[in-house]
Amino acid sequence: MFYEDIQPQKLKDFLLDPTHDTLCDLLLHNTGETDFLDFKAKWIDLTKLAKHILAIANSGGGSIIVGVGQQADGSSSLDGLSNQDFLDKADVDNKLGNYLPSWVKYRTEDFIFDGQASAPFTDKKFQVLIIEYDPKYVPYTSIISRGELRYGAIYIRQGTKSIEASNEKLLEIILRKVKAGDAYSTDLTLIEHLTQLKHLYAERNRQADDDYERFIERVIERKQRRIEQVLDVYGMADE
């Protein structure tokens, strides 16, 4: 699933149907990095990559295209990946799993163009991380502190950067979640509900802004009621 307002449209077309043709169309009409799209010349440090994945997943889903460089004037360069830099996609996905919550949905796809492909894709190789958006689970938080990652941090995209969410950005995430629906889906397990509640408690304890703290308190109360419903104890009188 992806956020309905993903931009540019060529990216949305690619995400819904990730083929060689839609990738070419996206790259040939590239308008630069956005909240939903990132380019890398080569594979980068896994903690940095995990940070970008969390940010894109929280922002609505999207992709990271590996094999696209940047020229001195800021324009993109469709260099592709060398054989040495073209990694095993299963290995990439498995290693990333050590840095990401298990419910973040992502996958790596290979795009190999042969000598018959039109320029500038002739004999080029690209790899693309496709990152989905699931309103049941956002906001995704970092599960470890290592390298670029801080435990419990919520990352979002801001143009070409992946940064920690401000109070205002966190509110945007929640409003987008509500708009997409399923904010309190019964598909969540009890453990997932409890994990979300734990993160809400931690978020409340580290905030100094009164308005934001009151907002978190309201969300905590609703989450507590939802957990009581899952346990079938909602409305029971205390003894």
Identify the role of each PLM range.
Residues M1-S63, V68-A72, A165-E239:
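Bergerat-fold GHKL/Histidine-kinase-like ATPase
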Residues H20-H29, V92-L96, F113-A117, S142-I143:
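Intrinsically disordered, low-complexity boundary segments flanking structured domains
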Residues D38-K42, S75-S82, I144-R146:
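Short hinge/gating elements
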Residues T47-A50, F86-K89, D123:
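Amphipathic alpha-helical transducer elements in NTP-driven molecular machines
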Residues K48, S75, Y137-Y140:
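Intrinsically disordered, low-complexity acidic/polar segments
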Residues I56-A57, N98, Q116-F121:
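Short, charge-rich binding segments
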Residues S63-Q116:
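A broadly used, surface-exposed interaction patch
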Residues W103-Q196:
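Intrinsically disordered, low-complexity regulatory tails
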